[in-house]
């Protein structure tokens, strides 16, 4: 009888435990850094650098119940040494557990994909010759 109770309890705990590791859900904020990549997330947008390229999301990054996010934005792949433009429409996708983030930027009007890159919350990005250069511009609501 004790074996049945123990087995039932074990199955119940396994069913309700998160065996995939901790998940993060909700708004993403703050500085996230990695090797030659970085993200600064605000309550209305996020600014991203991967190498000498950069862009901004059009909305706040918010992780779903599985820690995944997907946001539209604009991205410039001809930024260095002089920003030549244009800013391309892009999708910023990835996942996070609240400490480590995997991020991919996909330009939707070309075949260009940057990443995936791995970023750590609270870590300063190590950008080399192309530092994170600007806070996202205020949005006028017209695009």
Where do the PLM segments sit?
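Beta-strand secondary-structure signal
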Residues: 31, 47, 70-72, 93, ...
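Tryptophan-anchored aromatic micro-motifs
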Residues: 21-38, 71, 126, 131-140
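A short, compositionally biased
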Residues: 26, 41-44, 97-101
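Beta-sheet ligand-binding and adhesion/scaffold domains
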Residues: 75-143
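C-terminal motif of bacterial Sec signal peptides marking the signal peptidase cleavage site
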Residues: 15-16
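Residues that act as N-cap/strand-start positions at coil-to-secondary-structure junctions
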Residues: 26, 33, 42, 55, ...
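Sec-dependent N-terminal signal peptides
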Residues: 4-12
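N-terminal glycine/threonine-rich, aromatic-flanked beta-hairpin/loop signature
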Residues: 35-77
């Amino acid at each position: 009888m004790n074996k049945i109770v123990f087995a039932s309890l074990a199955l119940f705990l396994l069913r309700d435990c998160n065996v995939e590791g901790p998940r993060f859900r909700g708004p993403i904020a703050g500085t996230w850094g990695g090797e030659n990549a970085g993200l600064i997330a605000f309550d209305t947008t996020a600014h991203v650098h991967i190498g000498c390229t950069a862009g901004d999301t059009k909305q706040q990054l918010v992780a779903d119940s599985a820690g995944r996010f997907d946001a539209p934005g604009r991205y410039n792949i001809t930024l260095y040494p002089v920003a030549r433009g244009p800013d391309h429409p892009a999708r910023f996708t990835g996942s996070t557990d609240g400490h480590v983030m995997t991020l991919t930027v996909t330009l939707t009007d070309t075949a260009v994909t940057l990443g995936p890159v791995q970023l750590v919350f609270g870590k300063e990005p190590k950008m080399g010759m192309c530092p994170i250069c600007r806070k996202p511009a205020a949005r006028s609501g017209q695009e």
